[in-house]
Regions:
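Generic structural motif
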Residues: 8, 24-26, 207
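Juxtamembrane "helix exit" motif at the C-terminal ends of alpha-helical transmembrane segments
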Residues: 78-101
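A composition-biased, non-transmembrane "mature-region" signal
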Residues: 1-19
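Active-site catalytic motif of lipid deacylating hydrolases and related acyltransferases
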Residues: 14-72, 94-165, 212
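Transmembrane alpha-helical segments and their cytosolic interface motifs
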Residues: 69-81
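The conserved beta1-alpha1 loop
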Residues: 1, 22, 172-174
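Serine-dependent carboxylesterase/thioesterase catalytic core
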Residues: 139, 144-235
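Short, surface-exposed, charged/polar-biased interaction segments
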Residues: 39-42, 87, 91, 223-230
């Protein structure tokens, strides 16, 4: 996905070209998207983080990464708790007519959960859970299809570095932040970034880098983080 913005500021013309590396399709094809599937992913991901000691390591850090890691889990558990509470309340009302009707209140649960799912574009509980489950499925290693997507986008960045632009800015947001670091490290290792040459800048937004880097199989990400921490030609 790409687009271009032309502008004129104080009599000077500028042009910015934007390209986005889409990978949400990889998550969708590998993760079932139903409500029950999301809760199953939550339990599996929680087990991986707890059993591997990743959650304990995150707890030793400042609260930002901890909040990022726990938010979808807490939100999904809260949604289930609300659904159960409303089901109990509905059952209590039905029991006034007949004691055997109490369990009919359980029919409220799927409707409440579907209601929360409908507003996930604001709550991001299912969205983030799918992202985290995708990264945790291989315990921090990049799946092959994702590696191929990164290699393809790296070629786009290298092409931009060889063009006549003034600057190339690589932005990694949320779950894409750790992917951007691996992409950036590969570009730097290729020798495309030279001192005094075209400026390559990097901006990361979010705390997901830490939630992935502590996973047991995130060897390549930890190697990339170590490599980039020693770079001096980056902005």
């Amino acid at each position: 996905m790409a687009w271009r913005v032309d502008s004129e500021i104080d009599g000077r013309s500028t042009r910015a070209e934007f390209e986005v590396m889409l990978w949400s399709d990889l998550v969708r094809t590998s993760m079932r998207s139903g409500i029950l599937a999301t809760y199953g992913q939550m339990l599996r991901t929680a087990y991986i983080y707890i059993a591997s000691g990743t959650l304990w390591r995150l707890m030793q850090l400042r609260k930002g990464p901890v909040i990022a890691a726990l938010y979808p889990v807490v939100m999904l558990v809260a949604q289930a708790a609300v659904a159960l509470a409303l089901a109990y309340a509905a059952g209590a009302v039905l029991r006034l007519w007949h004691p055997g009707l109490f369990w009919l209140g359980m029919a409220v649960i799927p409707w409440v959960l579907m209601g929360f799912r409908r507003y996930d574009n604001r709550l991001f509980a299912h969205y983030l859970m799918h992202d985290y489950a995708y990264s945790a499925a291989a315990r921090g290693a990049h799946p092959r299809d994702l590696e191929a997507r990164l290699d393809e986008f790296a070629m786009r960045v290298l092409a931009a570095l060889r063009s006549d632009v003034d600057e190339v800015l690589l932005v990694g947001h949320s779950s894409g932040a750790h992917l951007a670091i691996s992409l950036l490290a590969d570009i730097v290792r290729s020798g495309a970034v030279q001192s005094g040459g075209l400026t390559l800048s990097f901006l990361s937004l979010g705390h997901v880098v830490l939630t992935v880097s502590f996973l047991p199989n995130a060897h390549s990400l930890r190697r990339d983080l170590k490599h980039m921490s020693a770079q001096r030609q980056m902005t």
